[in-house]
Amino acid sequence: MKVVNLKQAILQAWKERWSDYQWAINIKKNCPKGATWDYLNLAEALLEQAMIGPSPNPLILSYLKYAISSQMVSYSSVLTAISKFDDFSRELCVKSLLEIMDMFSNRLSCHGKAEECIGLCRAMLCTVVWLLQGCAWYCERLRDPNDFSALESSLRACLERMANLLHSTKNRALVHIARLEEQASWTNVEQAVLKLTENLSAVTNPTLKESLEECVSLVKSIPQMLCLQCDPPVHTTFPSVHAFIMLEGTMNLTGETQPLVEQLMMIKRMQRIPAPLFVLEIWKACFTGLIESPEGNEELKWTAFTFLKIPQVLLRLKKYPQGEKTQDFTEDVNVAFEYLLNLTPLLDKADQRCNCDCLSLLLQECNKLGLLSEANTATLTAKRSEDREHAPRLKTAENANIQPNPGLILRAEPTVTNILKTVDADHSKSPEGLLGVLGHMLSGKSLDLLLAAAAATGKLKSFARKFIKLNEFPKHISGEGSKSASVRALLFDISFLMLCHVVQTYGSEVILSDPSPSSETPFFETWLQTCMPEEGKTLNPDHPCFRPESGKVESLVALLNSSSEMKLVQMKWHEICLSTPAAILEVLNAWENGVLSVEAVQKITDNIKGKVCSMAICAVAWLVAHVRMLGLDEREKPQTMIRQLMTPMSGENTLQFYHERVVIMSSILEHMCADVFQQTGLSLRPAVEGQEPIPYRNLLPARLPIRQALQSQFRKVLEKGWVDSHAFHLFENLLHMGGVFWFTNNLVKELLKETRKEWASRVVELLYSIFCLDTQQITLTLLGHILPRLLTDPAHWHSLADPPGRALAKLSVWCALSSYSSHHKGQASARQRKRHREDIEDYTSLFPLDDTQPSKLMRLLSSNEDENSMLSSPGDRSISSSLSASQLHTVNMRDPLNRVLANLFLLISSQLGSKTAGPHTQFVQSFVEECVDCSEQGSRSSILQFMPFTMISELVKLQSLAKPKTVLSITDLSLPLGRRMAAKAIAAL
């Protein structure tokens, strides 16, 4: 039956005055088998015939009402038919259409196929346009005083239906899907809104006008449905921000600024921290770090981090794109400083430690960078000066002897740039001038200040490259006298010492460059990789690098054993350094076999350290590797040689800057030997009261199982409420010693012990910051091993009950989002890049996913089958049930993190479909809720893209997730299939 025949049937029924049920019986008899009334446009045909005259045909309208009541026609087809009527001057017709809408507008739903649900979305969008156009038409006519009351009544009728439609979040969600499905149709909405807004001035009734404005506002809010955030948290302290800043200041001064900014923004977004409190937490952590850092290098590092790096971080935060910006970032910084001024004891303690007004210096730095206005800077400075009048002071004599580190660091920063320029210049003709600059750098704590300033401003790598180049310079010898030979020796020695110091203070990754096939690897890089002892690095004393040509070794031994002074002319220092370990081995063997006396060995070690300290460092580097291989009773003589090499020479016959060079050499050797001397309970130098020999070394308590050490330290941190530098170093040691799985698993067990909600929340924040020690690997372990075991083993389900279960869900989502975001942007921190671990799993073989073939995928997406058969039950591991947005976005499934996320969501999906409820399903619910709360809406970086589409229908069975906004949030609305699945789920609510 074609539509024309349908019209004839309607006319026949009207002529013969059939009742509504007679009409229904007769029309069904003549309808072709299998055809649907929507396909035949029954609703449109009935309305078309009913609305021919100036008033509606009541009999034909009764047929339509019967069809709606008996579900012969769908709501979407009726709404579409209504929206095609455009003659608003026929008020009776419009009134009848609105009454038809009233029959079902309060129960708009669809339980059919996804395509039918999308049809309902489109129909609702058309209805919104129609109602807006109707309101605009009546508003425009209100300017005419004739028939004012009738027009206002019609306007009110249209408005009531529109308000009824739009006040439902479900309806707005369906319109939102239609907007994404058909962008062109949304243009009609915008035009209708514009026309209505233009004519609002004609409405004189204030209540009516206010209602119209409210409806317009609701329509405009539809595109931003997912941007509306919940209220910010009520608490004012955020341990995760505090601890993350402590971690970065303690362990990652050399890290790039942008990854730090991204990570901070991720924390701010996930916890919805107000900007002033966020900035305040950063400053609180900086001041805490300044106060508690050990004297020496660590104190300088914290000073550089606080006064140089953090202002730059804030500058980038100011420029960071933020959607819902409510006020200027400079005002946020100002408010944060006002809050900070209330923490007088913290500021006083920092001022005492640094011997200066720390806050005033920070305010000046922020003002220079445009983070604070002049007026605010002056007000805050005056307030702090007033508070300092009552602060406890150090004694005047003590004050006079202490130069404030913040001032020194701020002055060192421009000096770094000048030194880089100086070193870059051509010194081949007169290297003496450069030697003077280097000598000045060695005096006092100048070198440490310059290195800290360079590290905080991202110039340390450039600094190191320049000194590696300088270390290569003495290789080139051409007819030289004794003066130029000594200058060449000093240039080599000072650059070598500086580079060793940089490695021990900031890590070898600062020095090592990316391998280039064309250029030769510099000497120092080669020596560093093969010969230099570092924490956690074991060297083989029999490695070929310690065994150069025997002829060179013999001549060096003879030179060291002679009574005459070592000649510097034509000396190839790089070769000497490489030959020194073998020469030391010869000397040690001779001493152990009674060929050499103690006095003879002392003379040889004096010769080694007498001119260039680099030789002593190379000798001790090998001795440390050698001692590690010996039993405790065999170590006496090698350790005696180490002590001899560490003791400075007292004679006058030494090269320039000897005292300064020896100070650095002693520090380098002390770091090298700390581990081997600790094993025998010996020390290299007498301990100074109140000062650790080397900060953060040997933190693990003796004779205590590492699990107990971990539990004990974590309990201390939990009671304290924040993680200090000492704790971070201890946690890192435990992470290295126990491995990623052991570390993560035991800390998760600590979390699952917490049965109090507020304590469980605190544990989450602290664990998140501790896991930043190696976010990527810990996240892989947490999501790939620990959660699957807890979810699949019924014996563990009880531990997933709230509150610890919800806390674990929050922690898992935070880790997953942070890892995915930094991984997605390729921003692993230097601290994480440098780790080499043997316990890292091969996640590709561990989780063999069916890497969906594109041809299969396209066949699946173009299928016209019912979704119930296309997307089978979650328990089925077929290709269709595992289909997720990530596969349609062609995300690389061979990447470990992507693979683990995909498998976790498959597991969660199967748990939901297993029909067994319990704490594990409660955990799944919490996990998805956290994903929705924390994810950036509309972002491709959301981990929800790994969720199978079939999981949506299972999630809406959980009461707390059966919300339109939640469904919109968990589906990828940029994909047609995502929109269909969302429409199907929402339309059924």
From Swiss-Prot:
List where the motif LXXLL motif 2 lies. 359-363
Q: What is its main location?
A: nucleus
Q: Which GO terms describe its molecular function?
A: transcription coregulator activity
In terms of domain of life, where is this protein from? Answer: Eukaryota
Assigned keywords, A-Z: Activator, Developmental protein, Differentiation, Neurogenesis, Nucleus, Repeat, Transcription, Transcription regulation
Motif: LXXLL motif 6; annotated at 857-861
Q: Where is this motif: LXXLL motif 4?
A: 556-560
Kindly state the positions of the motif LXXLL motif 1 in this protein.
Answer: 343-347
- Motif location (LXXLL motif 5)? 787-791
List the GO biological process terms. enteric nervous system development; interstitial cell of Cajal differentiation; positive regulation of transcription initiation by RNA polymerase II; retinal cone cell development; thymus development
- Which family does the entry's similarity section mention? Belongs to the Mediator complex subunit 24 family.
UniProt function note: Component of the Mediator complex, a coactivator involved in the regulated transcription of nearly all RNA polymerase II-dependent genes. Mediator functions as a bridge to convey information from gene-specific regulatory proteins to the basal RNA polymerase II transcription machinery. Mediator is recruited to promoters by direct interactions with regulatory proteins and serves as a scaffold for the assembly of a functional preinitiation complex with RNA polymerase II and the general transcription factors. Required for proliferation of enteric nervous system precursors.
Q: What is this protein called?
A: Mediator of RNA polymerase II transcription subunit 24
Q: What taxonomic ancestry is recorded?
A: Eukaryota, Metazoa, Chordata, Craniata, Vertebrata
